[in-house]
Amino acid sequence: MPRAIKGVLIECDPSVKAIILKYDEESHDYIVEDLDDDRHLVIKESQLQNLKERLGRELDEKVMQPEESESE
């Protein structure tokens, strides 16, 4: 009998999609279906919040933050 997995359709930038694909290669926890080459994925509904938190942490580390003014 077929099993159904609840999924959520997400649209993201190609760079973010590449990060999600990398995560999924490690453990196959996130992606139900890769729909196209650019922006669309179906993500397991149960893993959506976990994925958002993990992406947030990684992007915070990689995005350059403007330095505070030294004149203050």
UniProtKB/Swiss-Prot annotation:
Chain's role: Component of the general transcription and DNA repair factor IIH (TFIIH) core complex, which is involved in general and transcription-coupled nucleotide excision repair (NER) of damaged DNA and, when complexed to TFIIK, in RNA transcription by RNA polymerase II. In NER, TFIIH acts by opening DNA around the lesion to allow the excision of the damaged oligonucleotide and its replacement by a new DNA fragment. In transcription, TFIIH has an essential role in transcription initiation.
Pfam families to which the protein is assigned, alphabetical: Tfb5
Annotated gene: tfb5
Cellular component aspect of the GO annotation: transcription factor TFIIH core complex; transcription factor TFIIH holo complex
Family of this protein: Belongs to the TFB5 family.
Source organism phylogeny: Eukaryota, Fungi, Dikarya, Ascomycota, Pezizomycotina
Description of how the protein assembles with itself and partners: Component of the 7-subunit TFIIH core complex composed of XPB/ssl2, XPD/rad3, ssl1, tfb1, tfb2, tfb4 and tfb5, which is active in NER. The core complex associates with the 3-subunit CTD-kinase module TFIIK composed of ccl1, kin28 and tfb3 to form the 10-subunit holoenzyme (holo-TFIIH) active in transcription.
Cell location: Nucleus
Originating organism: Aspergillus fumigatus (strain ATCC MYA-4609 / CBS 101355 / FGSC A1100 / Af293)
The entry's keywords: DNA damage, DNA repair, Nucleus, Transcription, Transcription regulation
The protein's name in its UniProt record: General transcription and DNA repair factor IIH subunit tfb5
GO biological process: nucleotide-excision repair, preincision complex assembly; transcription by RNA polymerase II; transcription initiation at RNA polymerase II promoter
Domain of life: Eukaryota
